[in-house]
Amino acid sequence: MLANETNKLLLSSQQEKPNHYTYLKEFRVEQCQSFLQHKCNQHRPFVCFNWHFQNQRRRRPVRKRDGTFNYSADNYCTKYDETTGICPEGDECPYLHRTAGDTERRYHLRYYKTCMCVHDTDSRGYCVKNGLHCAFAHGMQDQRPPVYDIKELETLQNAESTLDSTNALNALDKERNLMNEDPKWQDTNYVLANYKTEPCKRPPRLCRQGYACPQYHNSKDKRRSPRKYKYRSTPCPNVKHGEEWGEPGNCEAGDNCQYCHTRTEQQFHPEIYKSTKCNDVQQAGYCPRSVFCAFAHVEPCSMDDPRENSLSASLANTSLLTRSSAPINIPNTTLSNSINDFNSGSFAVNIPSSSLTYSPTNHANLFNVDAFNYGGSNKLSNSLSATQNDSSLFFPSRIISPGFGDGLSISPSVRISELNTIRDDINSSSVGNSLFENTLNTAKNAFSLQSLQSQNNSDLGRITNELLTKNAQIHKLNGRFEDMACKLKIAELHRDKAKQEAQEWKERYDLAQIQLNLPAELRDLSIQKLKQLQSKLRTDLEEVDKVLYLENAKKCMKCEENNRTVTLEPCNHLSICNTCAESVTECPYCQVPVITTHT
């Protein structure tokens, strides 16, 4: 089984991400051309993508067809000179060269981006320790699987040797996992009290350092225990300047300072610890810091009662709050008042030997005044007139439970004579007359209003047309006025410019006259005139010096006519033009003999 997996690993070519492929193939492989011309602005601090000096040069790692690398990923060359960057065997050396920054090992196919970085990222997404070119992964999306050589693949075939081997894969990651699985570090109170408060006792090469180690390795990594020292969660102004944390030793108060001295002290302060959500968990669903993360990995629980929410939702989605049947004796309500009005005086319901039943299938109200017994025509007429435009007129359908329909149905037990009596009483009363008169008056008023409205519409249309015509004329006049104002401004600018030029020519003429007769007339001038003349001459001289300096910097140092375009070697001075480059033998700037030239 293991042999088959090994063969698959050998035969399959790993597909690299574009960014990873660029770094593996080109990082520090070529020399920086801008540095040769003294134009590279990434030299101090050295963060350039290309190498500047020979000891920074990195060889491109390649896995050969036989399954081996062109140089080892673990064994360093003993003949390589770290100062000059020269190896007697050259690029064919099968061992690692300890270049500046150990780039050959870190950016090797075997190790590049195979382990998670132990340092955080800044606001731009760069590693706070290694910067833009960090060789470790920041997040699961940035991690890549390692490329093994044939020897490691053969080692994988023997499970026992793999378990007992000291060269186990990702040994530092396994050590970190063992640390994370320690029960005491699973307790947040223990982490808050002991994280980074003691120095690490392991050798530097055997410790991942950073957040993965619960002990500190330097002063910037140290954290004062909040049990022993009382300090606030705000940074110390003597240590932190802007976004950068300086040395804690810059604070004269030392450990007795009441402010944070390191980023670790601030993030793991009891007031800030686990108070905000972890970005890695929200974005990638995974946090490489595990139990040593200072940010929260759990969503906050909702404080609302789900039973209350479900009850509110049920009441909102149904008509129980607006259409429920309620007792009719609720005091101080519209429903109660309406019922009291119907139950008092001439509004009493009196249908002997009859009963009303509510049908769930009937949704129409057969009688708008079916429960009224005529007792006083004037009072009923006034009541109907007052409530004619009121949508809240109390009909029986408003007080009946919705479970029994929106209206009333007449039970067969109700005698037809009773209904006829009610109809005759209503027709014989003034209720019908008042309703008819009100309808007639309303129609008459509507007709008169309609004729008046049509007349007003015609007048309004005529006035609107006149206003549109006047507005068009006003816009036209405004356009002409703006054109005239623009022309006037241009004329004023020309006038002012002409005045200024005339004044300058007058001053030049006066100065020329003074210079022509300068020796004879200097003694005749007043002190004020002499001071003005001196100031003018000094200003002109300074301007001449500036122009002369700029022209000398651009023009060829030999002919002083053409611009500089040719760089001389070995001095790398850009000092002559193409015309003079053919005949020059030494640099006109430093007098060094010229070997080659390039543009």
UniProtKB/Swiss-Prot annotation:
GO terms for cellular component: cytoplasm. Belongs to the unkempt family. PROSITE patterns: ZF_C3H1, ZF_RING_2. It is found in: Cytoplasm. Its main location: cytoplasm. The gene is unk. This is RING finger protein unkempt. It holds the Pfam family zf_CCCH_5. The keyword DNA-binding applies. One of its GO terms (molecular function) is DNA binding. The modification Phosphoserine is found at S411. Disruption phenotype: Flies exhibit an 'unkempt' appearance: small rough eyes, held out wings and crossed scutellar bristles. Ubiquitous in most somatic tissues from syncytial embryo through to embryo stage 15. Expression becomes restricted predominantly to the CNS at stages 16 and 17. InterPro entries: Unkempt-like, Unkempt_Znf, Znf_CCCH, Znf_CCCH_sf, Znf_RING, Znf_RING/FYVE/PHD. Keywords: Cytoplasm, Developmental protein, DNA-binding, Metal-binding, Phosphoprotein, Repeat, Zinc, Zinc-finger. One of its GO terms (biological process) is neuron differentiation. Essential for late larval/early pupal development. A zinc finger (C3H1-type) spans 71-100, 111-141, 194-220, 230-264, 272-300. A zinc finger (RING-type) spans 556-591.
